[in-house]
UniProtKB/Swiss-Prot annotation:
This is Ribosomal RNA small subunit methyltransferase I. Keywords: Cytoplasm, Methyltransferase, rRNA processing, S-adenosyl-L-methionine, Transferase. Belongs to the methyltransferase superfamily. RsmI family. InterPro entries: 4pyrrol_Mease, 4pyrrol_Methylase_sf, 4pyrrole_Mease_sub1, 4pyrrole_Mease_sub2, rRNA_ssu_MeTfrase_I, SAM_MeTrfase_RsmI_CS. The keyword DNA damage does not apply. GO terms for molecular function: rRNA (cytosine-2'-O-)-methyltransferase activity. Signal peptide: none annotated. It comes from Campylobacter fetus subsp. fetus (strain 82-40). The keyword Protease does not apply. Catalyzes the 2'-O-methylation of the ribose of cytidine 1402 (C1402) in 16S rRNA. It holds the Pfam family TP_methylase. GO terms for cellular component: cytoplasm. Its EC number is 2.1.1.198.
Length: 271
């Protein structure tokens, strides 16, 4: 039997008794990073006085999926008590476990997903922004045109948007939002359920000022409210050119939505 097991996103007390029971019985653990999972098991054994001791560990991530499924004996997923554990939170949400779900479905392997901690739902509940519909984008592309387009799509969404972001890029994300829509309401939370959990909610411009004087360490979850203009359409280069703004500022805005070099755009505008 194959179980998909959610792990705490910070606070060990958030793991359920059912998850602990399955962990104690499991023979095989599949996970993204075996070091992270082994460390978690050590902590759980110490905290709850357990004897979690799976016989085998296997790593499954985006770089070894094909090799893993080519070599792993699928019969063992049916005859052994197997667990797929995420590094933190719910499996298969911005997580390579999704490929194992598909594999189980394609091969008629029974599986069960246990309930547990989930960072995006915690952020949704804490935001005061989301009531029903929302869009979850996971992690955005890191650089260039793809990232600029992804941010613009998020701002043009008909629904509030939830994004995962790293401490290295959280400031640039809020800066990009403030440049396109300074008054857009944004909620952000880091280190959720941990000792140094921190939450902020403000307009994008004011939030940027707050963050410039804050400790940015930790993984962030960002909730962007939908635009106050429900009929908002995608901003185009033509829209920006029609604005009463200095050419340098126009060049920067065009760069944000196209991913092209701002200096090159500016040179084209003045020639």
């Amino acid at each position: 039997m194959l179980y998909f097991l959610p792990t705490p996103i910070g606070n060990l007390d958030d793991i359920s008794k059912r998850c602990l029971d399955v962990l104690e019985l499991c023979e095989i653990i599949i996970c993204e990073d075996t070091r992270v999972t082994k460390s978690l098991i050590t902590l759980l054994n110490a905290k709850f006085g357990l004897q979690i001791s799976p016989k085998e560990f296997y790593s499954l991530h985006t770089h070894n999926e094909k090799d893993f499924f080519d070599k792993f004996d699928k019969v063992r997923l049916e005859t052994k008590i197997c667990i797929y554990a995420s590094d933190a939170g719910m499996p298969c949400i911005s997580d390579p476990g999704i490929s194992l779900v598909k594999f189980a479905q394609q091969n008629s392997i029974k599986y069960e997903v246990l309930s547990g901690a989930n960072a995006l739902l915690l952020a949704a509940a804490a935001s005061g922004i989301i009531e029903k519909e929302f869009t979850f984008l996971g992690f955005l592309p890191n650089l260039g045109k793809e990232r600029a387009i992804a941010i613009q799509n998020a701002l043009n969404s008909l629904y509030p948007v939830i994004i995962y972001e790293s401490p290295k890029r959280i400031l640039s994300l809020i800066k990009s939002i403030s440049e396109f829509d300074p008054l857009r309401e944004v909620f952000i939370i880091k280190e959720a359920t941990k000792k140094f959990e921190a939450k902020f909610k403000n307009s994008a411009t004011n939030l940027l000022t707050q963050l410039e004087n804050s400790n940015l360490n930790g993984e962030w979850c960002v909730v962007i409210d939908r635009s106050a203009n429900k009929a908002l359409e995608r901003i185009t280069t033509k829209d920006i050119m029609e604005l009463d703004l200095p050419l340098k500022q126009k060049a920067k805005l065009i760069s944000k939505i196209t991913g092209e070099n701002a200096k090159k755009i500016y040179q084209n505008l003045i020639t």
